């Protein structure tokens, strides 16, 4: 099932991809954590100190954007660190 399908079904879904933004030097990836059930997404984010106003409502897939140390900590606690490590292994090919 794709990330968009999982989000649409009201599941907490993770999607990590390459991302570079000059505002966040040193960050090469972002993890989108989405869920169409906004209350569920807010409750999920609260346990990690994420504020409801940080939810990105762009397109039809509400989500938090995780990056940097916060991304690594949350991905570790959620048992999803493999998504992040995949990109770290490939970073030498991105030069």
Residue ranges and their predicted role:
Residues 14-25, 49-57:
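Short, flexible, solvent-exposed loop/turn segments with mixed acidic/basic and small polar residues
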Residues 7-8, 31, 42, 46, ...:
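Intrinsically disordered, low-complexity proline/glycine-rich segments
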Residues 39-40, 70:
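Short Gly/charged-rich anion-binding patches and loops
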Residues 31-37:
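Short, surface-exposed ligand-recognition loops at beta-strand->loop->(often short) alpha-helix junctions
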Residues 13-14, 32, 63-65:
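Ordered hydrophobic segments in well-structured contexts
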Residues 27-30, 58-60:
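Short, contiguous strand/loop micro-motifs
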Residues 46-95:
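Short, compact, well-ordered microdomains
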Residues 1-21:
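Charged, low-complexity intrinsically disordered tails and linkers
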């Amino acid at each position: 099932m794709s990330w968009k399908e999982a989000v649409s079904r009201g599941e907490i879904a993770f999607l990590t991809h390459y991302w570079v933004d000059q505002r966040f030097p040193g960050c090469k990836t972002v993890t989108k954590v989405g869920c169409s059930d906004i209350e569920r997404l807010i409750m999920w984010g609260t346990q990690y100190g994420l504020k409801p106003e940080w939810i990105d409502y762009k397109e039809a897939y509400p989500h938090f954007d995780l990056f940097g140390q916060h991304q690594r900590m949350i991905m570790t606690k959620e048992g999803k660190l493999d998504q992040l490590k995949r990109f770290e292994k490939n970073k030498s090919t991105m030069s």
